[in-house]
Each structure stands twice: as C-alpha cells, then as structure tokens.
Amino acid sequence: EYYDDTDEEERIVSTVDAR
C-alpha cells in the first residue's frame, strides 16, 4: 500500500517506506 500523503519529492521515499 502506498501513501501519497507527503510531498511529491518525499512521495517516492514514502512509497518505499510504506511497503
């Protein structure tokens, strides 16, 4: 599940973290 709650730049890091 991916969380795009962060900024566009941090969104990429968030996706890997949400894994």
Swiss-Prot record:
It is found in: Secreted. Its main location: secreted. The keyword Secreted applies. It comes from the Eukaryota. GO terms for cellular component: extracellular region. Conversion of fibrinogen to fibrin is triggered by thrombin, which cleaves fibrinopeptides A and B from alpha and beta chains, and thus exposes the N-terminal polymerization sites responsible for the formation of the soft clot. Coiled coil: none annotated. GO terms for biological process: adaptive immune response; blood coagulation; innate immune response. The keyword Secreted applies. Heterohexamer; disulfide linked. Contains 2 sets of 3 non-identical chains (alpha, beta and gamma). The 2 heterotrimers are in head to head conformation with the N-termini in a small central domain. Cleaved by the protease thrombin to yield monomers which, together with fibrinogen alpha (FGA) and fibrinogen gamma (FGG), polymerize to form an insoluble fibrin matrix. Fibrin has a major function in hemostasis as one of the primary components of blood clots. In addition, functions during the early stages of wound repair to stabilize the lesion and guide cell migration during re-epithelialization. Was originally thought to be essential for platelet aggregation, based on in vitro studies using anticoagulated blood. This is Fibrinogen beta chain. It comes from Vulpes vulpes. The lineage of its organism: Eukaryota, Metazoa, Chordata, Craniata, Vertebrata. The gene is FGB.
